[in-house]
Amino acid sequence: MNCGPGSNDKKKFVKKNLKIVRRKIGKNTKDIFLLHQVHSNKFIFLEKNKKIPKKSPIVDAIITNQEKLPIAVLTADCVPILLCDNKLKFIAAIHSGWKSAYKGIISKVIKFMVKKGCNKNNIIAAIGPCISQKNYEV
């Protein structure tokens, strides 16, 4: 089920798939903030009380301190990484393939969160499933 706004699939099918996902998690069609992922080390920061872009930015991670803003990254073989600082109410979602990881996207996101006031000892990470080296040749 492809939900990627930056994919080569027909847009009408991507929109249909997104509607299914959003309905299942109880969110409006426009609620979840998605990215146009390109295997980079770039991210976007959606700051509290600031306007949210209408178009998906071309980046591979999102950081926000906006409450009630669902964020997501889409992965197949890449690693989804979620970060959270409960004290400052910051969250991040990272799309980390081998290219993004090599370019330092994970440390870049954490350094930015620390720059914004997060204590690195308060940041909790959740790492999602990905393909294994045994099953994938780079």
Where are these regions (language model features)?
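Active-site microenvironment for binding and transforming phosphate-containing groups
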Residues: 1-138
